[in-house]
From Swiss-Prot:
This is Large T antigen. Forms homohexamers in the presence of ATP. Interacts with host HDAC1. Interacts (via LXCXE domain) with host RB1; the interaction induces the aberrant dissociation of RB1-E2F1 complex thereby disrupting RB1's activity. Interacts (via LXCXE domain) with host pRB-related proteins RBL1 and RBL2. Interacts (via C-terminus) with host TOP1 and POLA1 allowing DNA replication. Interacts with host TP53, inhibiting TP53 binding to DNA. Interacts with host preinitiation complex components TBP, TFIIA and TFIID to regulate transcription initiation. Residues 417-579 form the SF3 helicase domain. Its EC number is 5.6.2.4. A motif (LXCXE motif) lies at residues 108-112. Residues 12-89 form the J domain. The modification N-acetylmethionine is found at M1. Isoform large T antigen is a key early protein essential for both driving viral replication and inducing cellular transformation. Plays a role in viral genome replication by driving entry of quiescent cells into the cell cycle and by autoregulating the synthesis of viral early mRNA. Displays highly oncogenic activities by corrupting the host cellular checkpoint mechanisms that guard cell division and the transcription, replication, and repair of DNA. Participates in the modulation of cellular gene expression preceeding viral DNA replication. GO terms for cellular component: host cell nucleus. The lineage of its organism: Viruses, Monodnaviria, Shotokuvirae, Cossaviricota, Papovaviricetes. It comes from WU polyomavirus. GO terms for biological process: DNA replication; symbiont-mediated perturbation of host cell cycle G1/S transition checkpoint; symbiont-mediated suppression of host innate immune response; symbiont-mediated suppression of host JAK-STAT cascade via inhibition of JAK1 activity; symbiont-mediated suppression of host type I interferon-mediated signaling pathway.
Length: 648
């Protein structure tokens, strides 16, 4: 301890710790007091910042000096350990005492001469005295540390590629390497063999240090092995690492600068001794993120929680699944068989939401790539294919066919040329010509404009937007349209026209400020929370509104205005056929597509879906003829139940 701090520094440190100088050298007590004083002097706790800085500097200096002195003592061959002190009074003790004091006498030797008494005359200095250089007061240069000293400061760099670099990990392993002093390595080699019943253990020297390598029959955390070794290395340095490549590490430690000292199996380890199950236990299946992404892509799911719920349903056994047993959905049966094993692993995963979010990102990325590489006509044809597949699952028998054809009859009662209107709208959104991209559905309340707009939105795919919100919130509302095929600005409010009972709103004013969005001539910036801005042509679509005034600057952006008028018989027939509203038949894209199949020739459809269109035309002819459909139209006109059959 006398070689650590100066006398004044030691006194100052003990005063700051609140200890008497008699406690100097009691490191555990000083450590306890140091932690206590840190809380007392800390500035955040109302302490003295200057005292805190001084205490830290002195205590850290003490720790460094103690470590340095310990290392120097280990390097000195002539230092006696306490167990080697001979018995007092024997010749061996006398020799030991003389050797012990010779070191201190050399250290305490002083070359200065005592001043002479005043009566003595000074002697004449010789030439040799004059030429003797004066003693320098500068600090002597520190001895350059060799590799043996440096080896104890860090883990060998030669082995870093074979070990785990994780600092805080709960991972369990069967291979470990311990780096410490040579003396402690001998002790730990025996203790570790006994404690962990090691399958293999070896000890290797590395300059003035040593390493112990062990293979255990059971898996352990690195912290468990490290804590066990700490019990034998209270002062000596210690590095404990988990090993990722056991044979690679052992092979490297048999070559320079390492030296094999001993091992419990003669001949050591061979490369063919190792298999994955030998080192890491039985192989465990891991969750396949790619399979989950493929599942989301096939179903077109872009909702995290919907994907999470659907995939969890696949974790049950196929034999116990009600959907599979009912054979209602062939696609579900196939997906359940393909993904049941992976879904079971997914149910045990602790990062379910993160995995689902990545799968959703894959779906969005695929959709964005398709929007760049495919024409709008091909995108719409693919959308129709999905709706036709959905029709195969939903419309299964005569009752379902009649229900959806009742919806077709209602639409033809709304507008006798509704099929021509829909066909022209589809042509407009596919061509997407600037300033000819938006239609306006205008009419009083309960005139059917929102029903038609919702069905067209479901047919083509897209999102409905609320434009009546304050202008400062529009950016995130418009961001919903990113990568969408169409949009609907629903129930836009504006300045009151002839109907004074309507409430006014700022929807028209907001649309007037979005002329670039409606024109489609230039790309606009769309943004969502937690996502970067996306530049794209804003999607075409529909604007629904009551009898509001359209600003003169906004009217040229609308390609066509479709006027709707309330019809009493439509409302009455709908009230008497509640199934259409309960099952949302009129708002479904399937109903509009069935209407096109019923009314339009096959040649009007894209070639890739014409075969399915022919199939559905034949199916409709099988379940409903022209006479029965005419009866449905008559029921709509009379305000009766559309599904009511007439007596012959």
């Amino acid at each position: 301890m006398d070689k650590t701090l100066s006398r004044n520094e030691a006194k100052e440190l003990m005063q700051l710790l609140g200890l008497d100088m008699t406690c100097w050298g009691n490191l555990p007590l000083m450590r306890t007091k140091y932690l206590s004083k840190c809380k007392e002097f800390h500035p955040d706790k109302g302490g003295n910042e200057e005292k805190m800085k001084k205490l830290n500097s002195l205590y850290l200096k003490l720790q460094e000096c103690v470590s340095t002195v310990h290392q120097l003592n280990e390097e000195e061959d002539e230092v006696w350990s306490s167990s080697q002190i001979p018995t007092y009074g024997t010749p061996d003790w006398d020799y030991w005492w003389s050797q012990f004091n010779s070191y201190w006498e050399e250290e305490l030797r002083c070359n200065e001469e005592m001043p002479k008494s005043p009566g003595e005359t000074p002697t004449k200095r010789t030439r040799e005295d004059d030429e003797e250089p004066q003693c320098s007061q500068a600090t002597p240069p520190k001895k350059k540390k060799d590799n043996a000293t440096d080896a104890s400061l860090s883990f060998p760099k030669e082995l870093e590629e074979f070990v785990s670099q994780a600092v805080f990990s709960n991972r369990t392993l069967t291979a470990f390497v311990i780096h410490t002093t040579k003396e402690k390595a001998e002790t730990l080699y025996k203790k570790l063999l006994s404690k962990f019943k090691c399958n293999f253990a070896s000890r290797h020297s590395y300059y003035n240090t040593a390493l112990v390598f062990i293979l255990t029959p059971f898996r352990h955390r690195v912290s468990a092995v490290n804590n066990f070794c700490k019990g034998y290395c209270t002062i000596s340095f210690l590095f404990c690492k988990g090993v990722n490549n056991a044979y690679g590490l052992y092979s490297r430690m048999t070559r320079d600068p390492f030296t094999l000292c001993e091992e419990n199996i003669p001949g050591g380890l061979k490369e063919n001794d190792f298999k994955a199950e030998d080192l890491y236990g039985e192989f465990k299946d891991q969750l396949n993120w790619k399979a989950l992404s493929e599942f989301a892509l096939e179903l077109g799911i872009d909702d995290v929680y919907l994907l999470l719920g659907l995939y969890l349903q696949l974790s049950i056994k196929v034999e116990e699944c009600e959907k599979c047993n009912s054979n209602e959905d062939a696609t579900h049966n196939r997906l359940h068989m393909e993904h049941q094993k992976n879904a079971l692993l997914f149910s045990d995963s602790k990062s379910q939401k993160n995995v689902c979010q990545q799968a959703i990102d894959v779906v969005i990325a695929k959709r964005r790539v398709d929007s760049l590489n495919m024409s709008r006509e091909d995108l719409l044809a693919r959308r129709f294919e999905k709706i036709l597949d959905k029709m195969d699952k939903t419309i299964k028998g005569e009752q379902d066919v009649l229900l959806y054809m009742a919806g077709v009859a209602w639409y033809l009662g709304l507008n006798g040329k509704i099929d021509e209107l829909v066909y022209r709208y589809l042509k407009v959104i596919v061509e997407n010509v600037p300033k000819k991209r938006y239609w306006v559905f205008k009419g009083p309340i309960n005139s059917g404009k929102t029903t038609v707009a919702a069905a067209l939105l479901d047919l083509c795919g897209g999102k409905a937007l609320n434009i009546n919100i304050p202008a400062d919130r529009l950016n995130f509302e418009l961001g919903v349209a990113i990568d969408q095929f169409t949009v609907v600005f629903e129930d836009v409010k504006g300045q009151v026209g002839d109907n004074k009972l309507l409430p006014s709103g700022n929807g028209m004013s907001n649309l007037d400020n979005l002329r670039d969005y409606l024109d489609g001539s230039v790309k606009v910036n769309l943004e969502k929370k937690h996502l970067n801005k996306r530049s794209q042509i804003f999607p075409p679509g529909i604007v629904t509104m009551n009898e509001y005034l359209v600003p003169a600057t906004l009217a040229p952006r609308f390609h066509k205005t479709v006027l709707f008028t309330p019809k009493r018989h439509l409302k009455e027939s709908l009230d008497k056929t509640p199934e259409l509203m309960v099952k949302r038949v009129l708002q479904s894209g399937m109903c509009i597509l069935l209407m096109l199949i019923w009314c339009r020739p096959v040649s009007d459809f894209h070639p890739c879906i014409q075969a399915k269109v022919v199939y559905w035309k034949e199916l409709l002819d099988k379940y409903i003829g022209l006479t029965e459909f005419a009866d449905m139209q008559m029921n709509v006109t009379n305000g009766c139940n559309i599904l009511e059959k007439h007596n012959a």
